[in-house]
Curated annotation (Swiss-Prot):
Residues noted as binding [4Fe-4S] cluster 2 in the record, renumbered to the chain: 178, 182, 185
Entry function: Catalyzes the methylthiolation of N6-(dimethylallyl)adenosine (i(6)A), leading to the formation of 2-methylthio-N6-(dimethylallyl)adenosine (ms(2)i(6)A) at position 37 in tRNAs that read codons beginning with uridine.
Entries under Gene3D superfamilies matching the protein: Methylthiotransferase, N-terminal domain (3.40.50.12160), Nucleic acid-binding proteins (2.40.50.140), tm_1862 like domain (3.80.30.20)
SMART domains documented for this protein: Elp3
Cofactor: record remark: Binds 2 [4Fe-4S] clusters. One cluster is coordinated with 3 cysteines and an exchangeable S-adenosyl-L-methionine.
Compartment(s) of residence: Cytoplasm
Descriptive protein name: tRNA-2-methylthio-N(6)-dimethylallyladenosine synthase
Keyword Cytoplasm: yes
Residues of the TRAM domain: 413-476
Domain of life: Bacteria
Domain MTTase N-terminal, chain residue ranges per copy: 24-140
InterPro entries according to UniProt: Elp3/MiaA/NifB-like_rSAM, Methylthiotransferase, Methylthiotransferase_CS, Methylthiotransferase_N, Methylthiotransferase_N_sf, MiaB_methiolase, NA-bd_OB-fold, rSAM
């Protein structure tokens, strides 16, 4: 499971600057993880060259696309409700075409197209370059489908448009797919095997973003720490590479250094990490470069060795602690967040207490916490009974949330009286007299506007906080501007 985009952004229709020559309208919504939002930018770029401008008005759209997530049942239910809405509009505007992209496309292709007949086209995560052909098929009166998973596709040759961007922060995709086969997760089945993007194309995209005024990028993948470029191909086939390919391969630590050195004033973040794949050289790279942010999203899923084994997580509780110890030793001011699942099949109270004690050991800045949601097609769904009562799941989740809020408040309290560097991203939601941005540790920070602008790096003296937000006063521009 991976970090989910802020709930307030889920389902936002995305829009980019129109091209005068384009005559057709595209309405595109995204749900789920950051990778889906990044993929929607790739789709919009491809379709912009096919005559489509984006619109936020569903009723005027010629083509409606929803980029979908299968991580949790709730996400699929939300998309189904949106498909009902699209089809209600389509009854008024029969010329409108509706398509499903992403993880649900691969999993539910037959149901959507043949049984329920609620969409015109179904396109999997590796087939977006085929969209122009598929749209032509639909316009000629045929259903269209391509959910073939690729061994090579990384979209490294596509320059993504930046949909609804603040002009400050951008995602840069570096890997696709996942090889880890966690028993609860659909990603390996919907996004395929791991493959990495050419580092040169990544650096070129970062340089292009810097030239356009962007101040921060997030290197993105289902498992960024397993990034490995040896000339192309699947990660699992690296063992068959030539000696020269092995000797000249680029791993994630090396990629971090390349990007950090290419743009020394640009903030570098990355997500998501897998504990079993994060190596000391990644932590060393973070410590060595000021512009690599002191923040790691490090999903653990459970604090119980027994449950970790059933999840096919290839690390133990103690190995996770060792990694945490190394991070805190080498990067003392590093923010750490997590994903946790409670109520996994067979989870006992002792297992649950192990999770709480792990949280006490780490004291995360924040986390993404869920009750277990059985996903069709996963190993857990096929081999393990979902045997934990919902009320037990909810009670355990609340205990996890309560403990996380306690730790979050302790962490933000510890920053009071210090000065942090904040990149201004937007106006505060609660006051038009304040800016909102994030510090290096990824903590939201608000402060009075004064004469600063979006995109400025500002030194802020912290005087108050909530469990999720730092509150301070600006004391001047940082030397990173």
């Amino acid at each position: 499971m991976e970090k989910i985009i802020d709930e307030k952004k889920q389902g936002n229709s995305l829009v980019l600057e129109p091209k005068a020559k384009n005559t057709r309208k595209l309405f595109i919504e995204s749900y789920g993880c950051a990778m889906n939002f990044s993929d929607s930018e790739i789709v919009a770029s491809i379709l912009s060259k096919e005559g489509f401008n984006t619109t936020q008005n569903l009723e005027e759209a010629d083509l409606v696309l929803v980029n979908t997530c299968s991580i949790r049942e709730k996400a699929e239910q939300t998309v189904r409700k949106r498909l009902e809405k699209y089809n209600a509009v389509k009854r008024i505007n029969p010329g409108m075409k509706v398509g499903v992209l992403g993880c649900m496309a691969e999993r539910l292709k037959d149901k959507f197209l043949e049984e329920e007949k609620i969409v015109d086209l179904v396109v999997g995560p590796d087939a977006y370059k085929d969209l122009p052909n598929l749209i032509n098929e639909v316009e000629e009166g045929r259903d269209a489908i391509n959910v073939i998973l690729s061994k090579e596709e990384t979209y490294g040759d596509i320059s993504p448009v930046r949909l609804q961007s603040n002009g400050v922060s951008a995602f840069v995709s570096i890997t696709r797919g996942c090889d880890n086969m966690c028993t609860f997760c659909v990603v390996p089945f919907t996004r395929g095997r791991e493959r990495s993007r050419d580092p040169q194309s990544i650096v070129e995209e970062v340089n292009d973003l810097a030239a356009k005024g962007y101040k921060e990028i997030t290197l993105l993948g289902q498992n960024v720490d397993s990034y490995l470029w040896y000339g192309g191909g699947l990660k699992k086939d690296f063992k068959n590479a030539t000696e020269i390919q092995k000797a000249t391969a680029t791993n994630f630590a090396a990629l971090l250094k390349l990007v950090a050195e290419a743009q020394p004033k640009m903030r570098i973040r990355f997500s998501t990490s897998n504990p079993q794949d994060m190596t000391l050289d990644v932590i060393e790279a973070m410590a060595a470069y000021r512009n690599i942010c002191n923040y790691i999203h490090l999903p653990v899923q459970s604090g119980s060795d027994r449950i970790l084994k059933k999840m096919n997580r290839l690390h133990t509780r103690e190995e996770y602690f060792t990694l945490i110890d190394n991070i805190k030793k080498m990067i003392p001011n590093c923010g750490i967040s997590h994903d946790l699942i409670t109520g996994f099949p067979t989870e006992t109270e002792e297992d649950h207490q192990d999770t709480l004690s792990l949280m006490e050991y780490v004291k995360y800045d924040f986390g993404y916490m869920f009750t277990y949601s059985e996903r069709p097609g996963t190993t857990a769904e096929r081999k393990l009974e979902d045997d934990i009562p919902e009320e037990t799941k909810k009670r355990r989740l609340q205990e996890i949330v309560d403990l996380q809020q306690k730790h979050s408040k302790q962490n933000t309290n510890s920053v009071i009286g210090t000065t942090v560097e904040v990149l201004i991203e937007k106006e505060s939601k609660k006051s038009n007299k304040h800016w909102s941005g994030r510090n290096e540790r990824n903590t939201v920070t608000v402060f009075s506007k004064e004469n600063y602008q979006i995109g400025d790096f500002v030194k802020v003296k912290i005087h108050d906080c909530t469990s999720a937000t730092l509150i301070g006063e600006p004391i001047g521009l940082s030397d990173n501007n």
